[in-house]
């Protein structure tokens, strides 16, 4: 049941996000600018979900992308969008949880 929910959110099977970051993955925080300013994963770039589709030029397709947001819902939507455009992408879920995984 839990894995089914994770799949629905675009989180899929567990991957080593820490290793992906070490290997050069880009963290994209899709929360609003105000949310991002209130705290974010070190090194993450902020492209709010509402404008992500218009800002794909900021992301290189040869780089792995990890999306994050507050809870995993918006980052799941971002993952779906980016995947449909040919990006290699993983849903990191909520930013605080992702930050803990990267320590």
Regions found by a protein language model. Name each.
Residues 68:
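Short, surface-exposed ligand- or partner-binding patches at beta-edge/loop junctions that are enriched
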Residues 2-16, 23-25, 33-64, 73-103:
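Rhodanese-like catalytic fold shared by cysteine-dependent sulfurtransferases
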């Amino acid at each position: 049941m839990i894995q089914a929910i994770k799949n629905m959110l675009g989180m899929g099977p567990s991957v080593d996000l820490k290793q992906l970051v070490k290997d050069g993955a880009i963290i994209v925080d899709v929360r609003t600018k105000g949310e991002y300013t209130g705290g974010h994963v070190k090194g993450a770039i902020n492209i709010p979900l509402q404008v992500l589709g218009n800002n794909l030029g900021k992301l290189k397709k040869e780089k792995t992308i990890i999306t994050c947001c507050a809870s995993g819902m918006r980052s799941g939507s971002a993952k779906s969008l980016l995947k449909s455009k040919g990006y290699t992408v993983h849903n990191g879920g909520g930013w605080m949880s992702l930050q803990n995984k990267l320590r």
